[in-house]
């Protein structure tokens, strides 16, 4: 071989070697960038996971706050209803003596038509707000509804029975505002 051929081969070999080195370097560089991207993706994935967890926590906190607010509103509405009933009860207790006076007047004397109309309107108004009278002669005696002022022994009854009503009792809805004051017949013996 001639020197020039030998030189050409060496140059080709160097070029091939340089080319191989460049290719390997580019390949390593590309692989390195893949490793870099993977390394970048991992923190990004962790960050996204953290953000998702924080978002879920915030959603949970919001749901809890909404539930707490709903419970507060319900409790407040219930408290307002209790206060309304208490206020109505107080107003009704003030009016009850007037109703009692009208009942006594009706029982012991005759009323003119205008007075009967006033009594009827007053009772109708009380019924509209939920006030009902109770306590009639012949009703079974109930200590939760009746206040016994007198007891009369009687052979005609088997159980304690209301004989006469001194003052009617009143309920506002299910709540007893005032027990009926009654005379009770009790069985002999």
From Swiss-Prot:
This is Protein GrpE. PANTHER family: GRPE PROTEIN, GRPE PROTEIN HOMOLOG, MITOCHONDRIAL. One of its GO terms (cellular component) is cytoplasm. Keywords: Chaperone, Cytoplasm, Stress response. Residues 1-54 are annotated as: Disordered. Residues 1-38 have a biased composition (Basic and acidic residues). GO terms for biological process: protein folding. One of its GO terms (molecular function) is protein homodimerization activity. Belongs to the GrpE family. SUPFAM superfamilies: Coiled-coil domain of nucleotide exchange factor GrpE, Head domain of nucleotide exchange factor GrpE. Its main location: cytoplasm. HAMAP family: GrpE. Homodimer. Participates actively in the response to hyperosmotic and heat shock by preventing the aggregation of stress-denatured proteins, in association with DnaK and GrpE. It is the nucleotide exchange factor for DnaK and may function as a thermosensor. Unfolded proteins bind initially to DnaJ; upon interaction with the DnaJ-bound protein, DnaK hydrolyzes its bound ATP, resulting in the formation of a stable complex. GrpE releases ADP from DnaK; ATP binding to DnaK triggers the release of the substrate protein, thus completing the reaction cycle. It is found in: Cytoplasm. Pfam families: GrpE.
């Amino acid at each position: 071989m001639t020197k020039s051929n030998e030189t050409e081969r060496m140059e080709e070999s160097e070029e091939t070697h340089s080319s191989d080195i460049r290719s390997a370097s580019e390949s390593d560089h590309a692989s390195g960038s893949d490793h870099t991207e993977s390394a970048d993706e991992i923190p990004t994935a962790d960050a996204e996971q953290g953000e998702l967890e924080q978002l879920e926590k915030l959603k949970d906190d919001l749901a809890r706050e909404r539930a707490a607010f709903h419970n507060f509103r319900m409790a407040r509405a219930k408290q307002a209803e209790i206060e309304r009933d208490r206020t109505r009860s107080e107003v009704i207790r003030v009016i009850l003596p007037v109703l009692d006076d009208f009942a006594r007047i009706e029982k012991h004397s005759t009323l003119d038509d205008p007075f009967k109309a006033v009594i009827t309107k007053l009772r109708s108004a009380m019924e509209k707000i939920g006030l009902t009278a109770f306590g009639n002669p012949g009703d079974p005696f109930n200590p939760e509804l009746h206040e016994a002022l007198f007891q009369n022994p009687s052979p005609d009854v088997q159980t304690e029975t209301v004989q006469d009503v001194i003052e009617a009792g009143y309920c506002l809805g299910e709540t007893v505002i005032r027990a009926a004051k009654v005379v009770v017949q009790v069985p002999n013996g």
